[in-house]
């Protein structure tokens, strides 16, 4: 009798699992800029542990080209405010369409799994970004970042190549001038801490 019940349970479970469920098709090419509370250069980006606990940061992802199941994502910007491994807030530019907003939300567990896991909110909001050869500024409703490029030999920007994560390719080293966050539950104010810009290419296999 137990054998029959076990076999029945297996059959029911197999019937409940869709066979050959279609996986979404997506890809993204983006410019990334971030400042966090770690020292320069942030050990997290090399696969290490934060130099400042908890690691507090703001990252802007500016999608240059990409799509999710046919929805064009070119021009979409989002800011992730985070306390690493604890929580995140994700703000998508209020210029996106409803269709793009839904596509970004669907893509969160695929492209932004770490941030998605502890996500406290996912909302549209005004986002600004200014980029020059030596300076990057960006802001959202609760956070702002102003950082300057770090120069090395012969006055050229410091570059780090072939970091472990795809997120950190063509990495240019920056240092924060001002990095702030203020909300009802969390706040910070950092300067002289790590910052960077990078290129990120990712997508479904």
Q: What residue spans do the PLM features occupy?
A:
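Compositionally biased, low-complexity repeat tracts
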Residues: 16-17, 191
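Beta-strand-enriched cores of mature, soluble protein domains
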Residues: 23-205
């Amino acid at each position: 009798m137990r054998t029959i019940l076990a076999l029945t349970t297996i059959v029911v479970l197999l019937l409940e699992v869709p066979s050959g469920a279609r996986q979404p098709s997506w890809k993204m090419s983006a410019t990334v800029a971030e400042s966090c509370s770690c020292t320069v250069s942030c050990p997290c980006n090399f696969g290490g542990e934060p130099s400042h606990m908890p690691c507090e940061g703001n990252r802007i992802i500016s999608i240059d080209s990409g799509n999710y199941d046919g929805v064009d994502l070119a021009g979409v910007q989002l800011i992730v405010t985070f306390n690493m491994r604890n929580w995140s807030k994700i703000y998508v530019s209020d210029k996106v369409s409803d269709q793009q907003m839904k596509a970004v939300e669907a893509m969160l567990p695929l492209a932004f799994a770490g941030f998605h896991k502890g996500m406290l909110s996912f909302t549209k909001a005004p986002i600004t970004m200014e980029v020059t050869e030596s300076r990057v500024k960006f802001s959202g409703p609760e956070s702002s970042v102003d950082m300057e490029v770090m120069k090395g030999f012969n006055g050229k920007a410091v570059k780090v190549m072939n970091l472990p994560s795809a997120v950190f390719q063509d990495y240019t080293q920056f240092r924060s001038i001002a990095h702030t966050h203020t909300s009802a539950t969390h706040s910070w104010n950092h300067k002289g801490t790590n910052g960077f810009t990078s290129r990120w290419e990712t997508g479904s296999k």
